[in-house]
Amino acid sequence: MTAIDVLRSAFGGAHHWYQGTVADITADQANHLPPGIAHPIGSQMAHILHSEDMMVGMLSGAPTLWESQGWGQKLGLPMLSSQTTEGSRAFHCDPSQLNDYCQAVFAHTDGYLSGLSAEDLDRPFDLSSWGMGAMPVGQILTTMLLGNTYAHTGEISALKGTLGLKGYPF
């Protein structure tokens, strides 16, 4: 396997876990306010998808699908990647509509990954505007994007548990 094959497999796994975890979420469950300051399931779902869309767009130098394909308007949702606790807790969505955006984002990510070379993974990418300086593309993909998807999918699984639901799909 090449490094790109490994990345595509890792993202495929993360996407599989996410999709399996959210497959049975209803609108009521997605928009349920958990105790404390935790973000609702629907807000977590949208954050995972929009963050991946945004980061792949940034790394590829292309506009996000959110902008270029009008997903914000289609879904009637604001920008999603960095919401305050208050904004996340006020967020409402229809998870079945987010699934269409999910399919587009995951296909776009796989297309981006399949076009990379091993050398591209070492290319520094400037994240100074985020307070992180330059970081290799491969590190951004593994620590930021994969980490974000797995971490928030875990939160969704735990939040499902608080509703008496099975979390992960196994």
Regions picked out by a protein language model, each given a short descriptive name:
Residues 22, 52, 106-109, 113, ...:
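A structural signal for well-ordered alpha-helices, especially hydrophobic packing surfaces
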